[in-house]
Amino acid sequence: MPRLCGSRSGALLLTLLLQASMGVRGWCLESSQCQDLSTESNLLACIRACKPDLSAETPVFPGNGDAQPLTENPRKYVMGHFRWDRFGRRNGSSSGGGGGGGGAGQKREEEEVAAGEGPGPRGDGVAPGPRQDKRSYSMEHFRWGKPVGKKRRPVKVYPNGAEDELAEAFPLEFRRELAGAPPEPARDPEAPAEGAAARAELEYGLVAEAEAAEKKDEGPYKMEHFRWGSPPKDKRYGGFMTSEKSQTPLVTLFKNAIVKNAHKKGQ
């Protein structure tokens, strides 16, 4: 009787397992191990025969079944329901009606083809290197992005050494005046001494003006262009430091008041 109850419970357990698996093939029930379920040994043999089929068709449960290789490629799983998905399509729109997996795989393949068909060497034997056309990021939208250096002025090269000495001897404004002056008309070759004397006088006058300007710059700086540079004496310190003559009428007024008060008290 206990063995019969055990066989009935085993048969019931086997029936529940077979009903739980939706894709169980028919050969498992038609095998010789599952024909006679009266004994416990036959029941265990039938369960062993149907166990591989159950493990392949049913979801993976904790146990020895989870050690089997996955039927689908895990790389095909794409989180297309997130908007930051790199390979999926936005808003769940995919090619065909098979979900986001097919469109994601197709897009990934297109990116691999565009990248040069994988990291291996190309047909010409040259390995793909880093992108040379990629510009470095510069914060030009900030005013401190590109520090402005000192502007270099072009160096003027003169054909003869006389003009070089002249450029070193005179300041910039005098050189501009010399450059803007009209050229002298051609003179007779019989009077070269007059041209040399005129040039010597011009250079002497320019040197004298330059020395006078340097002496003027050496003096103390006066802020005459500001109204507080040198205020008049009668307006210094708010007008309190005035001469004694301006205070004479006030002293006379005080004396007259004192005399009047003394005269009234004497009466």
UniProtKB/Swiss-Prot annotation:
KW Chloroplast (keyword) present = no
Gene Ontology biological process terms from the UniProt entry: neuropeptide signaling pathway; regulation of corticosterone secretion
Chain positions with N-acetylserine modification: S136
Question: Which SMART domains does UniProt cross-reference here?
Answer: ACTH_domain, NPP, Op_neuropeptide
**Modified positions (Phenylalanine amide) in chain numbering:** F87
InterPro entries noted in UniProt: Mcrtin_ACTH_cent, Melanocortin_N, Opioid_neuropept, PMOC, POMC-derived_peptides
- What does the UniProt entry say about where the protein is found? Secreted
Instruction: Give a yes or no for keyword Protein biosynthesis in this entry.
Output: no
What's an example of a GO molecular-function annotation for this chain? G protein-coupled receptor binding
The annotated regions of Basic and acidic residues compositional bias extend over 131-143, 215-237
Which residues does the annotated region (Disordered) include?
Answer: 88-156, 215-242
The signal peptide, as residue positions, is 1-26
Main location, first listed in the record: secreted
Pfam families named in the record:
ACTH_domain (PF00976), NPP (PF08384), Op_neuropeptide (PF08035)
Q: Where is the composition biased (Gly residues)?
A: 94-105
- Gene Ontology CC terms: extracellular space; secretory granule
State the tissue distribution: ACTH and MSH are produced by the pituitary gland.
Propeptide boundaries: 109-133
Q: How this protein is processed and modified after translation, per its record?
A: Specific enzymatic cleavages at paired basic residues yield the different active peptides.
Which residues does the annotation flag as glycosylated? N91
Which keywords does this Swiss-Prot/TrEMBL entry list? Acetylation, Amidation, Cleavage on pair of basic residues, Endorphin, Glycoprotein, Hormone, Secreted, Signal
User: Which top-rank group of organisms is this from?
Assistant: Eukaryota
Family to which this protein belongs: Belongs to the POMC family.
Q: Spell out the PANTHER family in the cross-references.
A: PRO-OPIOMELANOCORTIN
**What name appears for this protein in its UniProt entry?**
Pro-opiomelanocortin
